[in-house]
Each structure stands twice: as structure tokens, then as C-alpha cells.
Regions:
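Actuator/coupling domain of P-type ATPases
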Residues: 2-3, 15-21, 71-73, 77-91, ...
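Transmembrane helix-loop-helix hairpins at the membrane interface
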Residues: 18-98, 105-106, 151, 208, ...
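Cytosolic catalytic regions of P-type ion-transporting ATPases
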Residues: 62-66, 94-207, 488-498, 502, ...
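Cytosolic catalytic regions of ATP/NTP-dependent phosphoryl-transfer enzymes
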Residues: 162-165, 285-426, 433, 446-447, ...
Length: 793
């Protein structure tokens, strides 16, 4: 069958709609805005604005209203940005279906499959839609998703394969009869909201930190007004407004948003690098990996097999003819590749009758061969013949070739079992296939070594082939283990054996799972790659399961955390880099966020204890919080990675997020900002309260900008990289400086923000104070570089 034409498929797609189940409609913008207005912090601002209006200050109330609009807009924009990133990732990870259109087979997005399409089914793929089988060859389907019955159902031509069920063996062709909600799966689907994913370890840590800081923030926002009232016995109304503004500025409501946005945008960056994240917690786990178990074919090599050598005792013509028959002769029966047998068998029809053609590992074929084809015809296979043939296979493997053996025998008219088909064979010869190493594999493996990440190549190939390929990509094989050797070891012995090995040959997916669990028991954080149905347990068990996007099965992709669009090992390394960059940026954002809040509390508390007015009007505190939130939730997320990030050992995810080094750096940053603002405020106090407050306000905002640019590098100096390497932060910094100039020069803004005109000398005082404060932060960074040159903050 030629299948549908592309124009006809497009018409049917318009008529029947996409091949997907009906999803919950996205929330309209007005509902998101209402939810934003219902946030506790926004309600607190609304209450503050209402008090301003009630107490006869409509200008301040209007200013707070503008800030509320800006904050809600920022929050909704950030959430939509994260949702768009996640939706784009979901679309990238959507499975495809093999369809025949215009006489050609191509991969099409599953959503574009339409009634009338001819789809090709094979082991490891899900059935894309309800489809009536046109042909079936040993086809068995797992229908447990529909029926709950775990025993695979044998399928023949004429029967229906249902959408969402899994092909566990064999292959077939089918014509689609129903898609989307019209399928059996669509009729059974419940109208249920999608379950929320469980919180990640980092998410839990951030929420616990937020709860702890919430208590401190409430204490500060209540204590400061009370102490001020007791010491000064002043008017109550300004103190109430100051307390509300402090509560708004101090409560760490942005931290969960910072985490969600960081993870979502980090996942989008990974997608640009061909690593499609299916589970968001994988983004944070990638940066903690200590070990990677990787496939060879297609990951370290190009998966571009070229025939390099032929070894045929009876002549190459017989060998090539058998391979041609496998692909071109009419197929009577097929036994797909079996990992335990390491054989794939077909029974084809030829002019002279049926023939069994077997392809597989040399030792597996040799053990089932009773004869060998020689120039004079078939001869009995002696033990000496068998050893000589396997020695030839080993010689090819030693040259780094992937070696396959071919054998055949006549087939009678009746059906054969697999055991019958794969016994009494005549050995035809060997095919040596060359799979070129990926040029980027060697530097990627070197990067792993530098980063403290162990790499183990796990392959089904001959040990000699595996060792040659390992050396070609720069992976010194050391002791070469085989799957058979692992079978004879206890779990403890497996862990010990893996210590000195970089290659496991003749391995099965079951061996992959043992390797993963053995490493995890030893405290390693493990990534594993896989593409087959049987790889799913190892992919699910690993800390990060990585499936192949090109040749991988649906089952492997569904069990994985990350899908590689290009099947390239170097992409895994790039993903690890992104994971480390993401966590480093999250720490920077939180460090900046907490330092600013601590500095604000210290500045306000000092002024109260000295018997002075609070340095900031309530409306100024609210505006300052807006600028700080923008930097923490957007600018730091866009920060590129620091040099030397992959020279550090992997992060331990069990370590406290707010560790001693980070607390020390937060204290230093807060001290720098506190000293700058306090010095400028006290210096300007003799010229009047309004003047001093304005200088403090200007110093605070300029200090914010300088501190952000200093903290964007944990170890490098302020001037270590150009300011334009982070365009988001540069734009935010320029906007903040422009706002400062307008706030002291534009009469309308001066009234709204309670600022006074400043002379150039006042600006110089603010700038000098900021330089002094940032100098303290830079001095502390320099001390860390000297004391621990190779350790992350």
C-alpha cells in the first residue's frame, strides 16, 4: 500500500483534528491576573494603599496601585514564560509514528496521524491510534493500559491494535480507523485534572528556607515599628505603614517563583542543546552526577555502519547473497533480534524454496552451526573449524570492527519454531562493520574526567571491539568486564569490579540495571543511556535516565528523564554543564535576594536604635522591592556559566543549600550594602530628613545594581567579564539607573516617591558609598579565591 498522500492527510487532519485526547483549556489571562491579585503579598499592598487613601494621601495610594500593577504583570509574565518553556519541551518530547504516505515511510508527529493512515508497528513502539492490522509478523501487544491484563496479546491481520498499547515483539502494518477522543483510550479517559508532580529535593529545601525566613521577616516588620514607637513616641500612622511596607519587602515570597523560573528556563536552554527534559527534577540532578553508564553505538560512535571486511570460507558471493535475501526476498516468518540469544532470524521464499537466514554474534551463530560452507561446498563443522572461525572474528574485533556472523539452511513448507529455525545451520562467514567514533566524543570524555565524573561504556559488542573503540575515543579501558563475569559476582563484588573498569562488553539491559544499582549503593549519582524496551528498568532506576531520540523506542523515552535529540554523548556533557550553571545561578539569585533583605533590616534597625527616622518612606520600600524581585527572578537566571565550573567536583545534593560558605557570603554582601546606605544616610542627615532619605534611597538602588553585578560571579572579580555578557542584567541595571535619575529630577516622581532634589555632590556621596560597599564584597571574593582556589562557594 502507498498510504495517503500528504495533501489528503492534511485535509483529514483539518476534518478530524489532532490525534490527542482533549486537554484542560489553558487558564485565560483575566483569571491569572485575578489569581495574582489574590496573592498574600499583593493583598498586603492593597491594604497599605487602602490605608493611605483612608488617611488622606491619595497620591501615595495611586503610587502603590501602579506598583501593584507592575508586580502582578511581572509575576504573570514570569509564570507564562515558564509555562511556555515547559509546553515547548512537552511538544519536543512528543513521540512520533512511522507512517506510509505517498509510498514512502516517514516519521510523523503522533498528533498528525489521521484516519486512513498506514502505520508501521514494531517492538518498543506504542500504537499511535486505533488501527486495523493489514499484516502481522510475530506481533504481540501489551494492552494493560486499557484492560489491566499484563499478558501480551498475540495479534493477527484483521484484528485491531488500540491506541496507547505497546508492541512488545514482532512487527506489523495497520490502517488507522480512529484517532484522538474517538479511540478506545479516548472513550475510557476520565475527565481528571493532571496530577501535580511531587516537589523536588531542591524545591523542598527552598520552601523550608522560605518558611524559616518568613518567621524572621514577620519578627523584623513587627519589631522595628514597636521599637521606634517606644524610643521616639512618634505618630502611630507612619509606623503602621512602615511596618506593612517592611513586611512586604522582607517576606521571601519570591523564592519558589525564582526556583520554578530557573528550572523551566534551564530546561529550555537544555532543549536548545538537544537535551529534552521530560521531568523537571532532572534539570537540578544533572549537575550532581558522579557517574555515567553510556552505550557505545550512536552515542560514542556515529552509528554509521560501513562494511570494512568480509571473511567467507566459501566465497564472498554467498555471504552477500544471504544478506540480500534478508532484505529483499518475500518474507514468510520473522524472529526479531533477541538479546539473550543474540540472533535475528528470517524465513524467506526463493525460487528454489524456503530458506532460513540467521544473523548475530559469531559465538551464538557458531554454537548453532553444524556445517561450514567451503569453496568445495558444505562440510561438517569440526571443533577445530569452530575455533578457527571464532579466532577470525576476534581478529576483526581487535581492529575495532563490529562483527556479525551469517548462517543459513533450507526451510520446508511448514511453520518452524524459533529453536527449529536456529539449529542445524550452515556457516557462511563474517561481516566486519566499522562505526566511526564521534569526533566530539574524546573532548567530552576528557571534560567528564576533569569534572570528576566516571564514565563506563556498556555495550553488547565483543570485548576486543569494545576495547578498541574505547581507546579510539580516549577512554582507557583498563580492566574489561563482560556481562557473563558480572553474572557470577555478588552485588558487593560488582561494585569492587567496577572500580577498575571503564568497559563492560557483551552486556545486556539487565547488566545495565545491576551496574546502576551497584553504583547507587556505593553513593554514586548515576546517569544511564538506553534505547530499547529492555533498557526501561535501568533508565527508571538511574538518577537520570537518558533515552535516545533518534533510534530510541517509545518505552525507553517514557522511562527516561531526558531525551537526546541527537543521540550524542557530548550532549550529555553539555547537559551536565547546564545543570551546574543552573544551580550556580540559583545560588547567586538567592544570595543576592537574602543579602538585600538582610541589609534592609539592618539599615532600618540601626536608624531606629539611633533615634532617627526610618531611612525610607513606605512607598520607597515597596518600589525598592520591585526592582530587587526583577533582578532575582530574571537577571540571574540569564547568567552564563563561570569559567572553571567543570573543573570542580560534583555537588552533593544532600548538602545544605544554605551552607556555611553561602551564609558567610550573604553576610558579607549584606554588610557591604548596609554600610554603604547607612554611611550615606548618616552623612546626609544634618541637611534634613527628606534630603537624607533621598540620598539613602539613591544609594540603595545604585547599591542594588552594583551588588548584583558583583554577585553574578561567585569567584571572578567584578570586572572579570564584560558587563554585556548578561544582557538581561545589563538592561535591568541601566533601567534602574535611569529610574534613579528620574526619581530625583522629575517633579511628578519626586512627589510620588517622597524624594528631594539632589546636587551633584550628593550623587558623588551615594556613588562613593556604593563603591566602598562593593569593595568589601570584592575583597571577600578575593580572599575566597586565595583560600580555596579550586572549590565552589
Amino acid at each position: 500500500m502507498t498510504g495517503l498522500s500528504e495533501p489528503e492527510a492534511a485535509r483529514r487532519l483539518r476534518r478530524h483534528g489532532p490525534n490527542r485526547l482533549r486537554e484542560k483549556e489553558p487558564e485565560p489571562l483575566w483569571e491569572e491576573l485575578l489569581e495574582g491579585l489574590a496573592e498574600p503579598m499583593i493583598l498586603l499592598l492593597l491594604g497599605t494603599g487602602a490605608l493611605y487613601a483612608l488617611w488622606g494621601e491619595p497620591g501615595d495610594a495611586a503610587t502603590i496601585l501602579v506598583v501593584i500593577v507592575a508586580l502582578v504583570a511581572v509575576e504573570v509574565t514570569g509564570e507564562r514564560r515558564a509555562e511556555r518553556a515547559v509546553a515547548a519541551l512537552r511538544q519536543l518530547s512528543e513521540p512520533t509514528a512511522a507512517v506510509r504516505r505517498d509510498g514512502r515511510v516517514r516519521e510523523a508527529p503522533r498528533e498528525e496521524v489521521v484516519p486512513g493512515d498506514v502505520v508501521l508497528l514494531e517492538s518498543g513502539r506504542r500504537v499511535p491510534a486505533d488501527a486495523r492490522l493489514l499484516a502481522a509478523h510475530g506481533l504481540a501487544v501489551d494492552e494493560s493500559a486499557l484492560t489491566g491484563e499484563s499478558v501480551p496479546m498475540e495479534k493477527e491481520a484483521g484484528l485491531v491494535a488500540f491506541s496507547g498499547t505497546l508492541v512488545v515483539r514482532g512487527r506489523g502494518e495497520a490502517e488507522v480507523v480512529a484517532t484522538g477522543d474517538a479511540t478506545e483510550l479516548g472513550r475510557l479517559a476520565h475527565r481528571a485534572r493532571e496530577a501535580r508532580p511531587p516537589p523536588t529535593p531542591l524545591d523542598r529545601a527552598m520552601r523550608e528556607l522560605s518558611r524559616s525566613l518568613l518567621v524572621a521577616a514577620i519578627a523584623v516588620s513587627l519589631t522595628v515599628p514597636m521599637v521606634a514607637w517606644l524610643l521616639r513616641d512618634g505618630a502611630v500612622r507612619p509606623l503602621i505603614l512602615t511596618g506593612l511596607a517592611l513586611a512586604f519587602a522582607m517576606i521571601p515570597e519570591e523564592m519558589p517563583i525564582i526556583l520554578a523560573l530557573t528550572l523551566a528556563l534551564g530546561a529550555r536552554r537544555l532543549a536548545r542543546r538537544n537535551a529534552i527534559v521530560r521531568r523537571m527534577d532532572a534539570v537540578e540532578t544533572l549537575g550532581t552526577l558522579t557517574a555515567i553508564a553510556t552505550d557505545k553505538t550512536g552515542t560514542l560512535t556515529e552509528n554509521r555502519l560501513e562494511v570494512a571486511r568480509l571473511v567467507a570460507p566459501g566465497g564472498e558471493g554467498h555471504l552477500l547473497e544471504a544478506e540480500r535475501l534478508r532484505g529483499e526476498a518475500p518474507l514468510r516468518m520473522e524472529f526479531p533480534f533477541d538479546r539473550s540469544r543474540r540472533l535475528a532470524t528470517v524465513i524467506v521464499e526463493t525460487a528454489s524454496g524456503g530458506r532460513v537466514v540467521v544473523k548475530g554474534a559469531p559465538e551464538a551463530v557458531a554454537s548453532r552451526a553444524t556445517r561450514v560452507l567451503t569453496p568445495s561446498g558444505p562440510e561438517a563443522m569440526s571443533e577445530e573449524n569452530r575455533e578457527a572461525l571464532l579466532a577470525e572474528a576476534e581478529a576483526l574485533a581487535q581492529d575495532g570492527l563490529r562483527v556479525l556472523a551469517l548462517a543459513e539452511k533450507p526451510a520446508g513448507p511448514g511453520a518452524l519454531t524459533r529453536d527449529e529455525a536456529e539449529s542445524g545451520l550452515t556457516w557462511l562467514g563474517l561481516i566486519g562493520l566499522h562505526d566511526p567514533p564521534r569526533p566530539e566524543a574524546r573532548p567530552a570524555l576528557e571534560a567528564c574526567r576533569t569534572a570528576g565524573i566516571r564514565v563506563l561504556m556498556v555495550t553488547g559488542d565483543h570485548p576486543k571491539t569494545a576495547a578498541a573503540v574505547a581507546r579510539a575515543v580516549g577512554l582507557e579501558p583498563g580492566q574489561i568486564l563482560t556481562g557473563a563475569e558480572l553474572d557470577g559476582l555478588t552485588d558487593e563484588e560488582v561494585r569492587e569490579a567496577l572500580e577498575g573498569a571503564a568497559v563492560v562488553a557483551r552486556a545486556t539491559p539487565e547488566h545495565k540495571l545491576r551496574i546502576v544499582t551497584a553504583w547507587q549503593a556505593a553513593g554514586e549519582r548515576v546517569a544511564v543511556t538506553g534505547d530499547g524496551v529492555n533498557d526501561a528498568p535501568a533508565l527508571a532506576a538511574a538518577d537520570v535516565g537518558i533515552a535516545m531520540g533518534r533510534g530510541g523506542t517509545d518505552v525507553a523515552r517514557e522511562a527516561s528523564d531526558v531525551v537526546l535529540a541527537d543521540d550524542d554523548f557530548a550532549t550529555i556533557v553539555r547537559a551536565v554543564v547546564e545543570g551546574r550553571v543552573l544551580f550556580a545561578n540559583l545560588r547567586k539569585a538567592v544570595r543576592y535576594y537574602l543579602a538585600c533583605k538582610a541589609a534592609l533590616a539592618a539599615v532600618v534597625l540601626l536608624s531606629v536604635l539611633l533615634g532617627l527616622s526610618v531611612p525610607f518612606a513606605p512607598v520607597q520600600i515597596i518600589v525598592m522591592e520591585l526592582f530587587m524581585d526583577l533582578a532575582a527572578s530574571a537577571a540571574f537566571v540569564a547568567e552564563p556559566g563561570e569559567s572553571g565550573l567543570m573543573s570542580r567536583p560534583p555537588r552533593d545534593p544532600r548538602a545544605r543549600f544554605l551552607d556555611r560558605a553561602m551564609v558567610a557570603s550573604i553576610f558579607t554582601a549584606a554588610a557591604g550594602l548596609f554600610l554603604a546606605v547607612s554611611a550615606a544616610y548618616l552623612w546626609s542627615w544634618p541637611r534634613g530628613e527628606a534630603h537624607a532619605r533621598t540620598v539613602a534611597f539613591v544609594t540603595w538602588l545604585l547599591g542594588h545594581v552594583a551588588l548584583a553585578f558583583s554577585l553574578r560571579r561567585e569567584r571572578e572579580p567584578f570586572t572579570g567579564r564584560g558587563l554585556a555578557t548578561n544582557r538581561v542584567m545589563l538592561a535591568w541595571g541601566l533601567a534602574t539607573v535611569a529610574f534613579v535619575l528620574l526619581a530625583v529630577r522629575l517633579p511628578t516622581l519626586r512627589v510620588a516617591l517622597k524624594t528631594a532634589p539632589l546636587a551633584a555632590a550628593d550623587g558623588a556621596v551615594a556613588v562613593a558609598a556604593v563603591i566602598g560597599g562593593v569593595a568589601l564584597v570584592e575583597w571577600a571574593k578575593r580572599r575566597r579565591r586565595i583560600d580555596s582556589p579550586a572549590v565552589a562557594d
